[in-house]
């Protein structure tokens, strides 16, 4: 194991114009170009962190570009692949260029778009310059139309053409050089200034001159900004979480990887594309937890899979009851053949009998009496877990060992990692680790399971986590859902934080699922799957399991501490609804995006009405959900006709995709009724 951490140097970005001092002027007078480039977007924390996109999603960049006076400007968006760690600067290739278009002249706003061609990290910046030829042509046209003498203007224009001829370089541009020389000679052969001006003001000449601007005085916006381009499933996916040991078809034995593989067709039939496994490693025996988190475990109690490590191995080992490494690889391969990724749960914590405790005691914290310090979140105590000393004197060796955990599983074919409680580990550690892993495996996806304060959740997203857990689990009212979603899609997080909406987790059985019965499960499924483009459920959700420890948001007899074999086709399941909702998501591109979410008016506080549409309006989806699982609700739905490109009297086709109903509506509003037991939600596809 190397004793030094691989280098990681985050890019600090700001965009003031660089100034140089002219020694002939007083020291307080900087000499700089007259062009200013301000308010570049998108950017995160003034460019300190990259924005995020998925492959196939373009990056629209805008800025204010202006200068003193009335000289016309031109600008371009420059982009290229970012250098990889250890790669020389020249290895990333030349800048690609896209012209900027002025979209709001009164505000000096310019905009352009580029489409990164691959997964990875890309840099971008703006370059602007004064367009002297456009300025000359604009002023000369006005003077000609006013009947003014153009003698001096002609001389100025000729000088600009001569400078362009001299500036053109390269055999591929020789044709333009010849054209300009011919035009110049023809103009010089004319006797009158008016005749020369007419020739020089031709649109054909203007097009040639525009191809060769004088950019010697061009200004760049400063150090480049960056975008991380992730695989499409970083932005659109449906996760199914399972406890592998609970997948046995009969009670009383451990589930195996073979049992997990046997369930793949059923999971895929429900429309899930990411199979998320709770930790699969050996489980500690010291202070092992019993059922319902009890402190006493019986001889046959399996313990918590989050108490990682025992005599059989640690974070790169597999619990022997689950199977072998070859059988795990076979599960990953079989899932891949069915169009599914396998996500692995990585919990950076150790059982007291994890091999690292005896092999590397310097990686842990000990109390004054010599006992190892176990994990606490007062008043909660986790006697079966000990934490690592991330800032201890041996942190380099520890950090490298943890890096090897992720790269080991990546080598087994895993490209998706759900990280347990990352907010309890140092942010610099995650920034370094994720960047290092993605330098080797750029298609890796990291999900941050961090239910914590918003600044920490946002920071984890900024420094590299691909997806984030969210507060959706606890947002239940119309006001709460609307406010929270608008914060995510319209405010600062939109460019860097992708939320994965889990309707439940092994740890969390929300009160609304405990009390709302089957209608609550149907309601929350539709909300999670249509509000966000990435969502998930923990196994048992499809069976509407809601037995809880009284007064707590915790499952009774949780499979975190026990086996839980099930009849996966038990009466009352909502598997058909899940399959239908996932089919709708896959068939409608509007639902595969997140930042296009908008809320619309519904005249009932128990009805949430919202929608998404593609930029070209080719796919328009509106969703209405009854938030009351106990009673039917109805109300007027006010459709956004203008946003959909419809006039008030124009008829349009409405398909309610959950029921298959097809309607013809005209105008807005329209009344709709929701029965929590039979139609707790409606998903409308609008066709003008």
Swiss-Prot record:
Oligomer and partners: Homodimer.
This protein's UniProt keywords: Carbohydrate metabolism, Glycosyltransferase, Transferase
Protein family per UniProt: Belongs to the glycosyl hydrolase 13 family. GlgE subfamily.
Molecular function as annotated in GO: hexosyltransferase activity; hydrolase activity, hydrolyzing O-glycosyl compounds
Top EC category: transferase
Residues binding alpha-maltose 1-phosphate: 289, 349, 384, 421, 560-561
Source domain of life: Bacteria
CDD domains: AmyAc_GlgE_like (cd11344)
Active site: 420, 449
Protein name as catalogued: Alpha-1,4-glucan:maltose-1-phosphate maltosyltransferase
EC number of the protein: 2.4.99.16
Residues the record marks as site: Transition state stabilizer: 507
Gene that encodes it: glgE
Native organism: Rhodospirillum rubrum (strain ATCC 11170 / ATH 1.1.1 / DSM 467 / LMG 4362 / NCIMB 8255 / S1)
Keyword Transferase assigned: yes
Pfam family, one: Alpha-amylase
InterPro entries linked: GlgE, GLGE_C, GlgE_dom_N/S, Glyco_hydro_13_cat_dom, Glyco_hydro_b, Glycoside_hydrolase_SF, Ig-like_fold
Catalytic reactions of this protein: alpha-maltose 1-phosphate + [(1->4)-alpha-D-glucosyl](n) = [(1->4)-alpha-D-glucosyl](n+2) + phosphate
């Amino acid at each position: 194991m190397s004793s030094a951490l691989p280098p990681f140097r985050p890019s600090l970005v700001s965009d003031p114009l660089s100034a140089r001092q002219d020694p002939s002027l007083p020291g307080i007078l900087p000499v700089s170009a007259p062009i200013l480039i301000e308010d570049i977007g998108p950017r995160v924390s003034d460019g300190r962190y990259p924005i995020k996109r998925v492959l196939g999603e373009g990056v629209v960049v805008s800025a204010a570009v202006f200068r003193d006076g009335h000289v016309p400007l031109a600008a371009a968006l420059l982009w290229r692949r970012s250098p990889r760690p250890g790669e020389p600067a020249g290895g990333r290739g030349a800048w690609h260029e896209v012209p900027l278009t002025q979209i709001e002249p009164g505000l000096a706003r310019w905009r352009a778009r580029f489409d990164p061609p691959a997964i990875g990290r890309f840099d971008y910046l703006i370059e602007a310059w004064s367009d002297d030829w456009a300025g000359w042509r604009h002023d000369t046209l006005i003077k000609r139309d006013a009947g003014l003498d153009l003698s001096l203007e002609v001389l100025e224009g000729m000088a600009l053409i001569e400078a362009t001829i001299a500036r053109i370089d390269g055999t591929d541009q020789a044709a333009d050089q010849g054209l300009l020389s011919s035009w110049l000679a023809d103009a010089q052969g004319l006797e009158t200034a008016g005749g020369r001006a007419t020739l020089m003001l031709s649109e054909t000449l203007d097009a040639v001159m525009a191809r060769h601007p004088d950019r010697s005085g061009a200004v760049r916006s400063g150090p480049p900004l960056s975008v991380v381009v992730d695989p499409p499933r970083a932005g659109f996916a449906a996760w199914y979480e399972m406890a592998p040991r609970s997948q046995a078809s009969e009670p009383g034995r451990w589930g195996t990887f073979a049992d997990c593989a046997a369930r793949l067709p059923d999971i895929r039939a429900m429309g899930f594309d990411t199979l998320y496994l709770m930790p699969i490693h050996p489980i500690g025996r010291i202070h092992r937890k019993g059922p319902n988190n009890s402190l006493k475990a019986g001889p046959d109690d399996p313990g918590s899979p989050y108490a990682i490590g025992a005599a059989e191995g640690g974070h790169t080992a597999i619990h022997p009851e689950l199977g072998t490494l070859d059988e795990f690889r076979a599960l990953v391969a079989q899932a891949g053949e069915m169009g599914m990724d396998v996500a692995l749960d990585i919990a950076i914590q150790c059982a007291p009998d994890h091999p690292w405790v005896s092999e590397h005691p310097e990686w842990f914290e000990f109390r004054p009496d010599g006992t190892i310090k176990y994990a606490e979140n007062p008043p909660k105590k986790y006697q079966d877990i000990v934490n690592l000393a991330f800032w201890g004197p041996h942190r380099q060796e520890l950090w490298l060992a943890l890096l090897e955990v992720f790269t080991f599983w990546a080598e087994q074919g895993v490209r998706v990692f759900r990280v347990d409680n990352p907010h309890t580990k140092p942010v610099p550690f995650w920034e370094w680790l994720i960047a290092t892993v993605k330098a080797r495996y750029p298609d890796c996806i990291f999900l941050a399971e961090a239910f914590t304060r918003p600044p920490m959740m946002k920071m984890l997203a900024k420094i590299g986590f691909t997806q984030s857990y969210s507060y959706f689990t606890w947002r239940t009212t119309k006001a709460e859902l609307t406010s929270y979603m608008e914060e995510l899609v319209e405010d600062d997080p939109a460019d860097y934080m992708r939320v994965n909406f889990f309707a439940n987790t092994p740890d969390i059985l929300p009160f609304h699922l405990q009390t709302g019965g089957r209608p609550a499960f149907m309601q929350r499924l539709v909300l999670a799957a249509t509000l966000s483009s990435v969502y998930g459920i923990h196994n048992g959700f499809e069976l509407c399991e809601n037995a809880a420890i009284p007064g707590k948001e915790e499952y009774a007899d949780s499979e975190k501490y026990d086996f839980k074999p099930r009849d996966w086709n038990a009466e009352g399941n909502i598997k058909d609804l899940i399959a239908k909702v996932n089919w709708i998501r896959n068939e409608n591109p509007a639902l595969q995006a997140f930042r296009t979410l908008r809320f619309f008016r519904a005249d009932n506080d128990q009805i949430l009405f919202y929608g998404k549409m593609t930029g070209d309006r080719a796919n328009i989806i509106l969703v209405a959900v009854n938030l009351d699982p106990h009673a039917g609700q109805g109300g007027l739905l006010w459709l956004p006709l203008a946003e959909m490109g419809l006039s008030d009297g124009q008829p349009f086709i409405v398909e309610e995709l959950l029921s298959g109903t097809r309607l013809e509506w005209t105008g807005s509003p329209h009344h709709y009724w929701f029965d929590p037991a039979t139609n707790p939600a409606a998903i409308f596809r609008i066709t003008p």
